Amino acid sequence: MKKILMAASLAVGLAACTSMPTDTAGAGTVKKADMDRLVAVLPAAAQGSFTEFLAQAARENPLLRASVAAYAAKQPLAGDDLVNISRLLGLYNRLHNQAAVIDATAKMVAIPTVRADKVPPHEDKNIIAFGALVEGMARDFGLVYRNVDNRIFEVKLPGSSSEEFGILTHADVVPVVADEWVLDDGTRLDPFKLTRVGGNLYGRGSIDDKGSIAAVLYAMKAVKESGLPLSRTIRLMIETTEETGGDAMKYYRAKTALPEYNIVLDSKYPAVVAEKGSGALRASFALGPAAGAGATAITAMAGAASTNAVPQTATARLQGGNTADVAARLNAAKAAFVEKYKPQGGPFSIDVTQDGAAVQVKVTGASAHGSRPEEGVNPLPRLALFLKESGVALAPNGYAQAVRYLTDLYGTDYLGRTLGLAYADDFMGPLTMSPNLVREKDGQVDVLVNVRMPRGSTPEALSQATSARIKAWGTQAGVAVEVDHQQGNWMARDPKGAWLSTLLNTFGDTTGLEAKPVPTAGSTTAKLMPNAINFGPAMPGKKYTAHNAKEFKEVVDLDADMQMFTEMLVRIGNLSQMQ
């Protein structure tokens, strides 16, 4: 009975347009303002079926009546009809499934898929648990699931032909420093518990990349349940090692033919066609013997939890000598130091405390993604500068040498200028070199720098240049230094044709923002895929919180993802040709 009433309602709503032609390619499509009005008046309608939602939408906006009539008559959709129906399906998915997507994201965030030191990812219980979660969702949604040896979790929505297009995301996340997950009002967050505060969803992986996984799975569900035909199969591939080199994708490529065209959900909108190459530069110093009696030495330092994140805090522990005097000198110096360096990148703070026989120094800056040091205030080089300029004499161990290295070759510069390596590409932007991590390992003190290389050099040339420059510094300074620079290459593609224009049109009409291809300083597994470009999830003009302390996803942006992913699947799934 409900279905009969629903059909009758749809027929009444469309009565005025039954004589209109079904080929409405020139009739126009709804844009942001139209969709905003529908969202404002149709939230209740979205709690029913998609067919009921369409009937209400057609009553609200006459522009939609012909497209809705064509869908109701199960006619083949093309042109503006296909755009309008895919756009309405995106709206419906956003309104109908928002709570479910947030809940799914919470379940994913609760699985700490950080790479372990002693267990390979494909044997890690958390990666295996994540695959089981995705498998359950795929089964519930009527999708086809395949586990490729716990490296790639694959979900397919079959189309009518053998042709596929790929969607790529990743399940692994970067490590956290739990003490840094504290909001400005003092609220302490659990990084692995999705927490909504106002319009933000806090949690490791909320934006990178678990929110995208939940959103695209529900987009696939919405497309399947709508009954809209697809000429291409949609293949979702969920990577498990993206943050640590992409070994899983390399394994997958050796065993599975990749789709010819691929869309990655791991960067930013509107459409990313160029990526810098990501590199890790390590300088190592022998820890050396313990300091002699009466000498003050740095006995510990810490920065970020991973090389590809600008830290929120950096700390040093000083021991030996007159610790009360050391603490007093540092406290006396900190105010002037902050004022001196605040104009060079932004505000930061310094805390100095005496803890028994040790002095603890903590510099608090602003965390950022390692590819975007300009969005943060890196506390690690500022800590090194503070220790050097305070006038406190430090025993010449590996930590003191690391401090000298940081101050002599970096300071507050992250563009390679002090190293004499700076260059930039007009489209991709400048080389960046951000010192983010200090660790003690195997009798050495390591300083790790996240390098992002644009077009204009090669991995071999840049690695040779950095090694030569650092070794020359070591010789001049009388410091023994071991250098290792592993550098990935940049990617620049020039995609043309229908698939790119479809992505740009979807983004522009949904957001009202400028839609053109853009570069990113980030590096994703798009480099490992044929014809791959990124589509989201970060919005233009907003700080990208991936890899940050207090990583979050805005609910309004998650809504946009749900809406645009759904439209994208339908439209690209039915393109007559991709180019």
Where do the model's predicted regions map?
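Positively charged n-region of N-terminal signal peptides that target proteins for export
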Residues: M1-I4
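C-terminal motif of bacterial Sec signal peptides marking the signal peptidase cleavage site
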Residues: L14-A16
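Acidic/His- and Gly-rich active-site-bordering loop/insert found
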Residues: M20-L201, L230
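An extended, acidic, His-containing surface patch that forms the Zn2+-binding/catalytic region
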Residues: M20-M35, T364-L448, R452-A468, W473-Q579
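Alpha-helical metal-binding/catalytic segments enriched in His/Glu/Asp
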Residues: I167, T195-T244, R282-P289, A314-A324, ...
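Acidic-glycine-rich active-site phosphate/pyrophosphate-binding loop
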Residues: D179-R196, F285-L287, G292, T353-V363, ...
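Acidic/histidine-rich catalytic neighborhood of metal-dependent amide-processing enzymes
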Residues: D209-G288, N331, A335, D413-F427
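Short, conserved charged micro-motifs
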Residues: A291-A293, N322-L330, R372, G456-Q464
